Amino acid sequence: MATQTVEDSSRARPRQTSVGSLLKPLNSEYGKVAPGWGTTPLMGIAMALFAIFLSIILEIYNSSILLDGISMN
């Protein structure tokens, strides 16, 4: 068969590094959700501004906005 069983004793354990020890407290909140809406409205505003930016770029690309002093080929 293509499946291979690995015994627990033969597995290599992950090394503990100083960077890992420094970053471990930052990962302690993993999976926890803050109550309420949190930063959802801020993310919605950022998405709306990004959509407006993309539509402006698309309109310039399609030459549907004429800019004074800039010649388009």
From Swiss-Prot:
In the record, which positions carry Phosphothreonine?
3, 5
Keywords in alphabetical order, please: Chloroplast, Membrane, Phosphoprotein, Photosynthesis, Photosystem II, Plastid, Thylakoid, Transmembrane, Transmembrane helix
This protein is called Photosystem II reaction center protein H
Q: How does it assemble?
A: PSII is composed of 1 copy each of membrane proteins PsbA, PsbB, PsbC, PsbD, PsbE, PsbF, PsbH, PsbI, PsbJ, PsbK, PsbL, PsbM, PsbT, PsbX, PsbY, PsbZ, Psb30/Ycf12, at least 3 peripheral proteins of the oxygen-evolving complex and a large number of cofactors. It forms dimeric complexes.
Q: Which gene encodes it?
A: psbH
Organism of origin is Lotus japonicus (Lotus corniculatus var. japonicus)
Q: What does this protein do?
A: One of the components of the core complex of photosystem II (PSII), required for its stability and/or assembly. PSII is a light-driven water:plastoquinone oxidoreductase that uses light energy to abstract electrons from H(2)O, generating O(2) and a proton gradient subsequently used for ATP formation. It consists of a core antenna complex that captures photons, and an electron transfer chain that converts photonic excitation into a charge separation.
Where does it live in the cell?
A: Plastid, Chloroplast thylakoid membrane
Q: Which GO cellular component term is one of those annotated?
A: photosystem II
